Amino acid sequence: MAGGEPQSLEEAFAARRNVLAARRARERLRRLIASKSRHRFLRYLSWRFWKFERRDYWRKPKGNDNKMRLQLKGYPPIVKVGYRTPKAIRGMHPSGLEPVIVSSAKDLERLSPERHIVYIASGVGLRKKQEIRRAALERGFRVAN
């Protein structure tokens, strides 16, 4: 038999079960990523002043009597540790794959298409970018950019 083929029927079934288990695990991850709501933390008084509203970045309220800092009812939530993304899905692509930045076609050799999604580095030129994209698609990788 060839090198990659299973020796018996039991091994074939075991290999199939492993593939299905991995697929189910990735589906669970994908659902967990989708269900994780992303809070949009507002800057204090951004609902009142247009100049704060259009600047969409977080600033911690620090005033002595600031109602938002005191977490009073009717004021938006402030950034806290409890809002952090679960460790299992932190930094993952919404597809459930782990993102990897690639700067040459050689980098693809150490990666697995079942686990990784490819981002081509921003410093790569057009010709090399096309070469990396072609190599990635031949090996079955998904290219995100």
UniProtKB/Swiss-Prot annotation:
InterPro entries: Ribosomal_eL32, Ribosomal_eL32_arc, Ribosomal_eL32_CS, Ribosomal_eL32_sf. This is Large ribosomal subunit protein eL32. It comes from Aeropyrum pernix (strain ATCC 700893 / DSM 11879 / JCM 9820 / NBRC 100138 / K1). It holds the Pfam family Ribosomal_L32e. Keywords: Ribonucleoprotein, Ribosomal protein. One of its GO terms (biological process) is translation. Signal peptide: none annotated. One of its GO terms (molecular function) is structural constituent of ribosome. One of its GO terms (cellular component) is cytosolic large ribosomal subunit. Belongs to the eukaryotic ribosomal protein eL32 family.
